[in-house]
């Protein structure tokens, strides 16, 4: 089981340099955890690619369809008071943006407080 960041999900939806790595990781372990806003983050990335004309309208429609199918298959970590508490604590200890703290908190929550038990797939630089 791995927790997937949108930066690793988007390459499963459209061809990117990191697509082969994302696909290999998914084949190795098809159980996907994602936070409740992952779909919105992925949609934002797809919309940006379409606006920048890196993705045709037809390719974008297909990518959104793949996202819907993938979303239905992943395990989603919902926002809770506990998640908010962990995210707030992370912000006091680490230099993070709010959204990054929320996502990291979701991964920690999914790992039931034992982060080493769940892999984190992220291609952000």
Regions found by a protein language model. Give the residues of each.
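Short glycine/serine- and small hydrophobic-enriched flexible loop segments
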Residues: 11, 44-51, 108-112
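Short, well-structured N-terminal submotif of metal-dependent ribonuclease cores
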Residues: 1-39, 49-62
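Short glycine-enriched loop/turn motifs at secondary-structure junctions
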Residues: 25-27, 69-71, 113-115
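Active-site neighborhoods of divalent-metal-dependent phosphate/nucleic-acid chemistry enzymes
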Residues: 73-125
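Active-site-proximal, substrate-binding regions of enzyme catalytic domains
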Residues: 37-92
């Amino acid at each position: 089981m791995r927790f997937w960041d949108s930066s690793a999900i988007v390459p499963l939806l459209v061809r990117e340099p990191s697509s082969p790595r994302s696909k290999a990781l998914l084949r190795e372990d098809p159980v996907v955890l994602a936070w409740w806003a992952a779909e919105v983050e992925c949609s934002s990335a797809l919309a940006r690619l379409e606006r920048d004309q890196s993705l045709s309208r037809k390719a974008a429609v297909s990518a959104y369809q793949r996202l819907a199918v993938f979303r239905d298959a992943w395990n989603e970590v919902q926002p809770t008071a506990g998640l908010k508490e962990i995210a707030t604590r992370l912000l006091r200890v680490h230099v993070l943006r709010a959204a990054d703290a929320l996502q990291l908190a979701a991964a920690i929550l999914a790992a039931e407080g034992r982060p080493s038990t769940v892999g984190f797939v992220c291609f952000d630089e």
